[in-house]
């Protein structure tokens, strides 16, 4: 359900804005998206794992707030680009 350090560093290198960037909104949204994908796969197998389902909802809300931050701070084009790169739905349009 968690992501491996190798996968995390791969996501950081793919979504970083500059060298040494590990905590920008882009990177955080990418890491949250990967964790959400892992939990979704887990819940397909374990349908009655309600504690995990609640954790998934918390992560989805955190990612939505991060995407909203990107949209407000960097503009709609940067937001749409990030959504496209992550392969998720646009939640604000």
From Swiss-Prot:
Q: Which gene encodes it?
A: rpsO
Please give the SMART domains that the UniProt record associates with this protein. Answer: Ribosomal_S15
Q: How does it assemble?
A: Part of the 30S ribosomal subunit. Forms a bridge to the 50S subunit in the 70S ribosome, contacting the 23S rRNA.
Which keywords describe this protein according to UniProt? Ribonucleoprotein, Ribosomal protein, RNA-binding, rRNA-binding
Q: What is this protein called?
A: Small ribosomal subunit protein uS15
Question: Which BP terms does GO give this entry?
Answer: translation
**Mind telling me which GO cellular component terms the entry cites?**
cytosolic small ribosomal subunit
Query: What is the species of this protein?
Result: Anaplasma marginale (strain St. Maries)
| Family assignment from sequence similarity | Belongs to the universal ribosomal protein uS15 family.
Quote the InterPro entries the UniProt record gives.
Answer: Ribosomal_uS15, Ribosomal_uS15_bac-type, uS15_NS1_RNA-bd_sf
Q: What does this protein do?
A: One of the primary rRNA binding proteins, it binds directly to 16S rRNA where it helps nucleate assembly of the platform of the 30S subunit by binding and bridging several RNA helices of the 16S rRNA. Forms an intersubunit bridge (bridge B4) with the 23S rRNA of the 50S subunit in the ribosome.
Query: Among its keywords, does the record have Repeat?
Result: no
Q: Which Pfam families match?
A: Ribosomal_S15
Q: Where does the source fall among the domains of life?
A: Bacteria
